[in-house]
């Protein structure tokens, strides 16, 4: 876990030192459609929020490489009809590696922009309460993917996005009818992303 944090810090510092070329982009994601499966929770609803900060290094006039940070917050709760009454809160810090292209100009000031990225969890925290017990995660693993296409106007960007995340939290299990299941999040989302580059 410490090694992952060190690698993330060194990577961000490397990009930050290239100040003459690097731009920072902040991105807010607003899902409009989602499909979530949480192992151990069959009839529960998960609520998520996410924030992304990326450093973009130009490879050419219209192509950029990105290194960034994604923060995911998720909560899930058993329905009232459940006798176990499980409630879980999950937080994940992910390293984002991606690329973007904005070479298709619609007008002199508006361009089409395409982005894709892979997200790797570097650390996370989670707590699971229920069945008269409280559990805390001991680690996190998994992978995430992000794709978007949209319009870029100056420093502003609006895009339609698709993303999927598969995250497992070590040390968390749900027990129902004497059967234990390891907790993992499988989240697929479609929505609108708003970005600003500075």
Q: Where in the sequence are the language-model features?
A:
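Cleavable N-terminal export/targeting peptides
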Residues: 1-23
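Short glycine/proline- and aromatic-enriched beta-strand/turn motifs that initiate or cap beta-hairpins
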Residues: 20-65, 70-77, 189, 195-197
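Detector for outer-membrane/organellar transmembrane beta-barrel domains
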Residues: 24, 85, 94-102, 111-123
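Repeated loop/turn-to-beta-strand initiation elements of outer-membrane beta-barrel proteins
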Residues: 24-26, 61-67, 106-110, 155-160
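Transmembrane beta-strands of outer-membrane beta-barrel pores
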Residues: 28-34, 69-75, 101-103, 118-124, ...
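Flexible, solvent-exposed loop segments that connect beta-strands
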Residues: 32-45, 70-92, 122-141, 168-185
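Residues on the lipid-exposed face of transmembrane beta-strands in outer-membrane beta-barrel proteins
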Residues: 51-59, 69, 97-101, 116-118, ...
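Predominantly the C-terminal beta-signal and adjacent terminal strand-loop region
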Residues: 78, 144-198
